[in-house]
């Protein structure tokens, strides 16, 4: 169980590093955020079942719902930005002019 938790924490940290490194493209940032949410979902599910905290069983599902909403809003923004500006470079955007 410890090695699984350690692997999931490492996966979360790698996705966080990906967000920090690949923040110039919106698509790369969204993919790294999805990796972070997936590792958090699996880690929360494993911890809840390991410690028998079944009163918290809905928490990973709520996280998954928020993750799906975040992905939908992010993809909608990506489509809108790509249509108006021609690329997904975050540095070329000035949201005050839109």
From Swiss-Prot:
UniProt keyword annotation of Calcium present: no
Coiled-coil residue spans: none
Pfam families linked to this entry: Oxidored_q2 (PF00420)
Transmembrane segments: 1-21, 29-49, 59-79
GO BP, one annotated term: ATP synthesis coupled electron transport
Membrane protein topology class: Multi-pass membrane protein
Signal peptide range in chain numbering: none
Protein's cellular compartments: Mitochondrion inner membrane
Keyword Translocase: yes
GO molecular function: NADH dehydrogenase (ubiquinone) activity
Substrates-to-products reaction catalysed: a ubiquinone + NADH + 5 H(+)(in) = a ubiquinol + NAD(+) + 4 H(+)(out)
EC main group: translocase
UniProt xrefs under InterPro entries: NADH_UbQ_OxRdtase_chain4L/K (IPR001133), NUOK/Mnh_C1-like (IPR039428)
EC annotation from Swiss-Prot or TrEMBL: 7.1.1.2
Superkingdom: Eukaryota
Keywords: Electron transport, Membrane, Mitochondrion, Mitochondrion inner membrane, NAD, Respiratory chain, Translocase, Transmembrane, Transmembrane helix, Transport, Ubiquinone
GO cellular component: mitochondrial inner membrane; respiratory chain complex I
Family of this protein: Belongs to the complex I subunit 4L family.
Function: Core subunit of the mitochondrial membrane respiratory chain NADH dehydrogenase (Complex I) which catalyzes electron transfer from NADH through the respiratory chain, using ubiquinone as an electron acceptor. Part of the enzyme membrane arm which is embedded in the lipid bilayer and involved in proton translocation.
Quaternary structure, from the entry: Core subunit of respiratory chain NADH dehydrogenase (Complex I) which is composed of 45 different subunits.
Protein name as annotated: NADH-ubiquinone oxidoreductase chain 4L
